[in-house]
Swiss-Prot record:
BP terms from Gene Ontology: peptide transport; transmembrane transport
Keyword terms of this UniProt record: ATP-binding, Nucleotide-binding, Translocase, Transport
Protein name as annotated: Putative oligopeptide transport ATP-binding protein YkfD
An MF annotation (GO) of this entry: ATP binding
Organism domain of life: Bacteria
ABC transporter domain: residues covered: 7-252
InterPro entries: AAA+_ATPase (IPR003593), ABC_transp_ATP-bind (IPR050319), ABC_transporter-like_ATP-bd (IPR003439), ABC_transporter-like_CS (IPR017871), Oligopep_ABC_C (IPR013563), P-loop_NTPase (IPR027417)
Lineage: Bacteria, Bacillati, Bacillota, Bacilli, Bacillales
Transmembrane portions of the chain: none
Pfam families reported in the protein's UniProt record: ABC_tran, oligo_HPY
Biological source species: Bacillus subtilis (strain 168)
Residues given in the record as ATP binding sites: G44, E45, S46, G47, C48, G49, K50, S51
Coiled coil segments of this chain: none
Similarity comment: family membership: Belongs to the ABC transporter superfamily.
CDD domains, A to Z: ABC_NikE_OppD_transporters (cd03257)
Length: 329
């Protein structure tokens, strides 16, 4: 059974003034949906706009154009009072577990603060009990509540950040590269923790990352971003088994394979040049300057994200005949 959309993004743009009449097009016309109860993975190289997109969804930025609707409500057209109420439903886990926690507050105070701001639960004692429950839920002993952030490892700090995000009983969480600053062994622990919490609490996640090998294990569907544009969206298993967009293929070919023989035999797709500047993106398809399959028409018109089969979207002139699902070459 196909789940209903919880959050819908339509033609979203987030441009920044760079001075001297220049504009940084961090997000440039992105459209997608996140279904209730799923984890939507968002991947791409550093600088592609994925973290900016996550911050727009959290209303940390006011979009230049487009809309973000949550259960049919436009998040960027809310009054101040309505925004305050919505803050309980939408929370964020930040990338840097070292910078996102106040060093002057104890762990208990960090987790307690959102509940006090929103006046949750009847008494201070009841809130303290919830703090202990949250610490246990993320794998930390309640006694750790009296300690300060500098006393913990990176993985433990990220667990504290997760507990803080859960303190308001949210429905939707933006996890902005929550494992990128952690050791590989700790990354797996945090991913497994998020999967367990999602199952127990019915959470919906936007999981932002640049490491496709880890995104595979947590995401139901994945969107691939490049230079502010969505290149491909499909089910996680389908993306890894049969990627369509040349950029997706290149990203997947960079994931190392543990078997040395298979690693030596497989074809690697090396992208030409550097990521273009979002101040001056290429005309037509923004990926054409690095694409191994670029055609003349790629510089003439920008391919639109189109559904070439149920639940599968790609923005590439190679698949312009959506009705027959045929590749041009």
């Amino acid at each position: 059974m196909r789940r209903l959309p919880l959050l819908e993004v339509s033609q979203l743009k987030m441009h920044f003034d760079a001075g001297k009449k220049r504009t940084v097009k961090a997000v440039d016309g992105v459209t997608f949906q996140i279904r209730e109860g799923e984890t939507f993975g968002l991947v791409g190289e550093s600088g592609c706009g994925k973290s900016t997109l996550g911050r727009v969804l959290m209303r940390l930025y006011q979009p230049t154009e487009g809309s973000v609707t949550y259960r049919g409500t436009n998040l960027h057209a809310l009054s101040e009072k309505e925004q305050f109420a919505f803050n309980r439903k939408l929370q964020m886990i930040f990338q840097d577990p070292y910078a996102s926690l106040n060093p002057r507050m104890t762990v208990r105070e960090i987790i307690l603060e959102p509940m006090e701001i929103h006046n949750l639960y009847n008494t201070h004692k009841a809130r303290l009990l919830v703090v202990d429950e949250l610490l246990e839920a993320v794998g930390l002993h309640p006694d750790f509540g009296s300690r300060y952030p500098h006393e913990f490892s990176g993985g433990q700090r990220q667990r504290i950040g997760i507990a803080r995000a859960l303190s308001l009983n949210p429905e939707f969480i933006v996890a902005d590269e929550p494992i990128s600053a952690l050791d590989v062994s700790v990354q797996a622990q945090v991913v497994n923790l998020l999967k367990r919490l999602q199952k127990e609490k019915g959470l919906t996640f936007l999981f932002i990352a640049h490491d496709l090998s880890m995104v595979k294990h947590i995401s139901d569907r994945i969107g691939v971003m490049y230079l502010g544009h969505m290149m491909e969206i499909t089910e996680s298993g389908t993306l890894y088994r049969e990627p369509l967009h040349p950029y997706t293929k290149a990203l997947l070919s960079s994931i190392p394979i543990p078997d040395p023989e298979l690693e030596d035999k497989r074809e690697r797709i090396l992208l030409k040049g550097e990521l273009p500047s979002p101040v001056n993106p290429p005309s037509g398809c923004v990926f054409r300057t690095r694409c191994p399959e670029a055609m003349p028409e790629c510089g003439e018109s920008r391919p639109q994200l189109q559904e070439i089969e149920p639940g599968r979207f790609v923005a590439c002139h190679l698949y312009r005949n959506a009705e027959t699902k045929e590749k041009v070459r």
